[in-house]
Amino acid sequence: TNALSMTDTIDLTSISSPISYKKSIPGQTQTIACPVRLPGYVRGIFFSRDSRPVDFEWPNNTNRLLPWVFNDLKELTDTRYPGIPSNATPSTLGDALLLELTNGEYLFAKAVAGRNSLSWLQVNDNGSVTLYVSTLGKDYLKPEVPLLLIRQGKDIYSTIRQAYQALMKNTEAADLKSRTAKEYFEAFRYLGWCTWEHYHDDINESKVINDMKTIEASGIPIRYVLIDDGHLAHKNRQLTGFIPDKQRFPSGWKKIMSYKKENKIKWIGLWYSLSGYWMGLSPENGFPQVVRQALYPHAGSLLPGTDSTRIRSFYRYYISTLKEQGFDFLKVDNQAFTLPLYMGGHESIRQATDCNRSLEAEIHRQNMGLMNCMAQNVINTDHTSYSNSTRVSIDYKKYDEDMAKSHLFQSYTNTLLLGQTVWPDHDMFHSCDTVCGTLMARSKAISGGPVYLSDAPGDFIKENIFPLIDEQGKLFRPEAPAVPMPESILTNPLWSGKAYRVAAPSGNGAMTLICYNLNASPRHQQVQATIKKEDYSLRNSFEKMSATPEERVLLYNWESQKAEEL
């Protein structure tokens, strides 16, 4: 990066404001680099994607924002760093840092967006940190831009929560509401089914209809179906229109919509990309002329823009077209790649942000549901003004135990951050997965987010499904999403040699807790976990809840169906 090096240090040993600003940036500057002074720390987590040579890098975080645990930051650039199984090495460019300090307190720092600027953190070989801020395009930075969201405190949960509360108040850096202040789309309160992990993109009209019939006859009260990738009309991975591929879906969506029933499959959702398809919109498209006027060519693709009004008009057409075809909600994927599609042009960050803002506004205005996916860069995460569900992890894969363990570690840790503003989506799973099925079912149960199967409908295993739902398919959900217990937050449970404990506050003043052995090493095939009476007091730390001191605490083991007093 051709960045202007700034001499003044961003001093995190002395915090005066929850969002720090850089002032007096010289004119005609596109990118600045600021050294960061860290307080003394014991250990921490750096949140960044993995660095895969064949893949795009930051800011295309996709679903790959991962928690890289360290005792010293320079470990992350060491080739011997153990990492996270099923993932590549840590990217040194990231979005957040969580530290346990030598004084016993905690420090949380997160990159932020401005009107047309974006910051990110870089870990250097010697363990030092540099903060960059850029327009990522041809424009120059304004004289004053936001740098970092920062919070320090004695309790790890409240430190992160208070940081996000400050972010929600800053309308320049974010357009956010807390998870508890937003509506949760009704369909996501029920069990669903998705085409992706069963078919990937090999879907067509007859397969979907046959599976809907099989689902209805299965005795499993699945209440929504999500049709994932494989239906889109496109050329070279660029969208040509919002009508499905005519060879695969000759009837459009009419036949499929006719299978909706109030007491069976009530809702149907559809997958699309934020920018149309993986590589944007095709110049050879069938959009109405008024929609074409809202698009412009950039770097081989058509994109919505350049002003906010045109971008909003494109998303108004996008959402209304799919709503008119009968869909109740959308899974909008590939969100993190929208910014790279705009990069190198004018007002790249502002336009990419407008895409997220417009999507949110139109989904809300037209009363549709929204699942956010591959939406883990700052622009995506910090502009969920209405939607209340975002994927927090890399895809689940059938029969892959290492990937399942990594998936759980990432999901629970990322929920500490993303769970402040949305319910976490732990991805779909196969109930028939003989390796990971029960593992996945339990994590979905305490995530509080959407729960959707992806088995072939004839392969459902009821033992991994019925404990999650009532007779109408309504999910039993906790009062807040599950997060790691304090001793499990700043450790890598795949190498720690210890148990990994997560918990969520649940109904009637209860707390639901899972003790995992996620260790990848055969040396730790068995670990011991302890549950103490004092653990119950943490129920009020996960959310800002009123204290409920209890003289007696009862522990109920769901597996054995037995209870004992702690």
Residue ranges of predicted features:
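N-terminal accessory beta-strand-rich subdomains and adjacent acidic, glycine-rich linkers
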Residues: 1-169
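Alpha-helical scaffolding within the catalytic cores
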Residues: 170-181, 253, 313-318
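Aromatic-lined carbohydrate-binding/catalytic grooves of carbohydrate-active enzymes
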Residues: 186-349
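Short helix/strand-capping turn motifs
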Residues: 191, 467, 481-482, 487-495
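Flexible loop/turn segments at secondary-structure boundaries
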Residues: 199-203, 232-236, 275-281, 337-341, ...
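Glycan-recognition surfaces
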Residues: 278-323, 357-462, 483-487, 491
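Carbohydrate-binding surface patches
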Residues: 444-447, 452, 491-547
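Solvent-exposed beta-strand/loop surfaces of large extracellular or lumenal domains
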Residues: 550-566
